[in-house]
Amino acid sequence: MQRRLVQQWSVAVFLLSYAVPSCGRSVEGLSRRLKRAVSEHQLLHDKGKSIQDLRRRFFLHHLIAEIHTAEIRATSEVSPNSKPSPNTKNHPVRFGSDDEGRYLTQETNKVETYKEQPLKTPGKKKKGKPGKRKEQEKKKRRTRSAWLDSGVTGSGLEGDHLSDTSTTSLELDSRRH
């Protein structure tokens, strides 16, 4: 008796653990159907969320429209020809527009959006005024010659040494060009 009971249990466990197609469908087909059901649930959830968001927008739009018209009525009753104070902002409020996701919550609703500056095309760099370096070298030579002519001899520097440095600077200048 116990042997027969163990045998029946083992067959039952085997049948339950073995993947058997049910109703002509494979087990993989069943899992696909379950996945489809999950995606359907996600779709319904997203749809419900969007409907709730739309209702919230309509409610806020209606609420702000009442506030906006109440503000206009109050100001028009006070004085019809008065100018608005300069510190008030008159930014247009837009609802339900397609560009709603572009703005952060702390940004104001300005009409103009930020426009990126066009990138500069790489081109030739501007060169300085031609001959500027030569003019600087001439100035240096003039100051040296004025210094030598002023009578600062005996300072330990010889005239030949100074003329050598001016020659080397001229040589360097000619090498650069």
UniProtKB/Swiss-Prot annotation:
Result for mutant: R57A: Strongly reduced affinity for PTH1R
Maturation-removed propeptide residues: 25-34
A GO biological-process term: negative regulation of cell population proliferation
Biased composition (Basic residues): 122-132
PTM comment, free text: There are 3 principal secretory forms, called PTHrP[1-36], PTHrP[38-94], and osteostatin (PTHrP[107-139]) arising from endoproteolytic cleavage of the initial translation product. Each of these secretory forms is believed to have one or more of its own receptors that mediates the normal paracrine, autocrine and endocrine actions.
Superkingdom assignment: Eukaryota
Database matches in Pfam families: Parathyroid
Primary localization class, coarse: secreted
Signal sequence residues: 1-24
Family of this protein: Belongs to the parathyroid hormone family.
Functional summary from the UniProt entry: Neuroendocrine peptide which is a critical regulator of cellular and organ growth, development, migration, differentiation and survival and of epithelial calcium ion transport. Acts by binding to its receptor, PTH1R, activating G protein-coupled receptor signaling. Regulates endochondral bone development and epithelial-mesenchymal interactions during the formation of the mammary glands and teeth. Required for skeletal homeostasis. Promotes mammary mesenchyme differentiation and bud outgrowth by modulating mesenchymal cell responsiveness to BMPs.
Summary of subunit composition and partner proteins: Interacts with PTH1R (via N-terminal extracellular domain).
Official protein name in the record: Parathyroid hormone-related protein
Organism: Homo sapiens
